[in-house]
Design a protein with these regions (language model features):
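Glycine/proline-rich, positively charged
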Residues: 1-103, 107-108, 114-120, 127-128, ...
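Structured C-terminal cap/extension of enzyme domains
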Residues: 59-61, 89-209
Length: 209
């Protein structure tokens, strides 16, 4: 059972959606009764809510938390958008408490499979036989605390590429991680509009839809 969109609208939205109406207490009881096997939440937005819910882990015993994690957001999420939180912090906080992570946006809304030509050349020079996207999927899947990595697949080629990447998964080495972090630093030199096409900001009050 996933509590979706935690953090959007801040603490007030979380309390109105899940606490004041008794929904969270109900779900905790349902899990205790065995009718819900796993209970967790997906985090979007306000870090205060994320930190609060993790501080309640002893009480709620979260079975998983879904976070946005990729090699660009690892250290640059806040740089891209001040409302974001770096994935390094999010994953680290889950690890401290032994909470498994489900990874969303491993390709950052497709941006990590559609990168600048200089970045494509850099990745291809290193591993000519690998797709650009596979680097991001290997990064997301290499962390020991990751339960699963979500992938939005439009075409059969996407599925086949994912199967090549994960069956079996070759976790990144420390040197490969450094290579990707350097790649992320280079990507930040080519600024783009920080849009994941998630449409969470729509309808836009300024009409930019």
């Amino acid at each position: 059972m996933l509590l979706h969109g935690i953090g959007m609208g801040g603490m007030e939205a979380y309390e109105n959606r899940y606490v004041k109406n008794g929904i969270l207490d109900f779900l905790l009881e349902e899990r205790k009764a065995g009718r819900i096997r796993n209970l967790g939440f997906s985090y979007h937005g306000d870090i205060e809510v994320f930190d609060y819910l993790l501080s309640k882990h002893d009480e709620y015993q979260w079975d998983f938390v879904q976070i946005q994690l990729n090699y660009l957001d690892w250290k640059h999420a806040k740089e891209i958008n001040p409302r974001n939180t770096d994935a390094e912090y999010l994953y680290g906080e889950l690890q401290k408490r032994g909470i498994p992570a489900i990874i969303m946006e491993p390709l950052l809304g497709g941006r990590l499979s559609n990168v600048h030509d200089h970045i494509v050349a850099r990745l291809k020079q290193r591993e000519p036989g690998r797709s650009v996207a596979s680097w991001a999927f290997r990064f997301a899947g290499s962390f020991p605390g990751v339960l699963t990595v979500l992938s939005g697949m439009t075409y059969m080629e996407h599925l086949q590429d994912n199967l090549r990447t994960y069956c079996p998964l070759q976790p990144l080495t420390e040197e490969e991680n450094r290579f990707l972090f350097d790649t992320a630093d280079l990507m930040m030199q080519y600024p783009t509009i920080p849009c994941n096409d998630c449409k969470y900001c729509m309808p836009c009050p300024y009409g930019i839809d």
